[in-house]
């Protein structure tokens, strides 16, 4: 693969492509600010330096770049055989995904897959570990097939059922509603579910921004633009990952709806 195929962040190009008519009216200082908060230069240097690393090796390079360390609890709860669905809270939006994939990837010899936004497929090193999903646009009709392919594979599945990273509500930092997909698909594929708790939090600025946008009725996820900045704020830290006991897929019977079972598992995660 040549260097030409390497994905690099280019804020100017993104703005020209996504907003061609408005681009010439965007002040240069705004473009410079966006480059700063997404850490364009630093991340591009890393992507270039790690361009030959794939899969779990790429995640390890990410861990080193972020100087992230992980303390693992409940390692005895990780099954040696069988296929499972690992579901975790999503406090950070960066280190949590990287660290969880790294820990499980090393434990299961690289046989792990994330269900992720298809935009992350642009990261060449991460792509081999991803099942791309897109609920909007032309690919929306293929969403069920994409999810099905992941669960029918011989890889361990890693999911963040909230989709978005945690928000602060009534003073408590916690995931928003967990989607029921992991319950339905785990039953169909007869995969037990392993609850995972990842310790960590973003800055007060991030939570305040998300809440202000919500209060103003702004639908665009502005807080998402700051996730790279939050990732850099969380460098040089040690995070605790706790694995709970596997929950047999037969547990998820008709006594609750899939959405209620998803909430049930979420509650278990926050008690770990």
From Swiss-Prot:
Q: Which cysteines are joined by disulfide bonds?
A: none
Q: In which pathway does it act?
A: Lipid metabolism
Q: What induces it?
A: Is constitutively expressed.
Name the EC number(s).
2.3.1.-
**What's in the keyword line of the UniProt record?**
Acyltransferase, Lipid biosynthesis, Lipid metabolism, Transferase
- Its domain of life reads Bacteria
Q: Which reaction does it catalyse?
A: a lyso-glycine lipid + a fatty acyl-[ACP] = a glycine lipid + holo-[ACP]; N-[(3R)-3-hydroxyhexadecanoyl]-glycine + hexadecanoyl-[ACP] = N-[(3R)-3-(hexadecanoyloxy)hexadecanoyl]-glycine + holo-[ACP]
Q: Where is the signal peptide?
A: none
A Gene Ontology biological process in which this protein takes part is: lipid metabolic process
InterPro entries per the UniProt record, alphabetical: ACT14924-like_Acyltransf_dom
Q: Name one Pfam family in it.
A: Acyltransf_2
Give one GO term, molecular function aspect.
acyltransferase activity
- Outline what the protein does: Is involved in the production of glycine lipids (GL), which are phosphorus-free membrane lipids important for fitness during growth of the human gut bacterium B.thetaiotaomicron in vivo and in vitro. Catalyzes the second step of GL biosynthesis, i.e. the O-acylation of the hydroxyl group of lyso-glycine lipids, resulting in the production of the mature diacylated glycine lipids.
Similarity section? Belongs to the O-acyltransferase GlsA family.
What is this protein called in UniProt?
Lyso-glycine lipid O-acyltransferase
Organism per entry: Bacteroides thetaiotaomicron (strain ATCC 29148 / DSM 2079 / JCM 5827 / CCUG 10774 / NCTC 10582 / VPI-5482 / E50)
At the highest ranks, the source species' classification is:
Bacteria, Pseudomonadati, Bacteroidota, Bacteroidia, Bacteroidales
């Amino acid at each position: 693969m040549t260097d030409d195929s390497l994905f690099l962040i280019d804020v100017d190009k993104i703005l020209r492509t996504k907003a061609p008519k408005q681009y010439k009216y965007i002040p240069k200082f705004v473009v410079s600010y966006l480059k700063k908060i997404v850490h364009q230069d630093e991340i591009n240097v890393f992507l270039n330096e790690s361009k030959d690393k794939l899969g779990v090796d790429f995640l390890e390079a990410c861990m080193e770049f972020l100087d992230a360390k992980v303390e693992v609890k409940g390692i005895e709860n990780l099954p040696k055989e069988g296929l499972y669905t690992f579901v975790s809270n999503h406090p950070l939006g960066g280190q949590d995904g990287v660290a969880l994939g790294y820990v499980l990837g090393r434990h299961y010899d690289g046989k792990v897959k994330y269900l992720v936004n298809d935009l992350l497929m642009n990261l060449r090193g991460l792509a081999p570990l991803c099942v791309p999903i897109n609920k909007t646009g032309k690919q929306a009709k293929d969403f069920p097939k994409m999810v099905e392919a992941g669960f029918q594979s011989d890889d361990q599945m890693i999911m963040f059922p909230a989709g978005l990273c945690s928000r602060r509500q009534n003073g408590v930092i916690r995931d928003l509603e967990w989607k029921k997909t992991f319950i339905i698909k785990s039953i169909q594929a007869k995969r037990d579910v392993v609850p995972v708790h990842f310790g960590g939090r973003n800055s007060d600025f991030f939570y305040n921004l998300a809440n202000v946008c919500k209060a103003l009725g702004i639908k665009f996820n502005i807080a998402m633009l700051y996730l790279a900045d939050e990732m850099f704020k969380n460098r040089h830290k040690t995070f605790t990952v706790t694995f709970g006991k596997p929950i047999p897929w037969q547990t998820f019977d008709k006594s609750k709806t899939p959405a209620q079972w998803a909430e049930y598992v979420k509650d278990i995660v926050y008690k770990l």
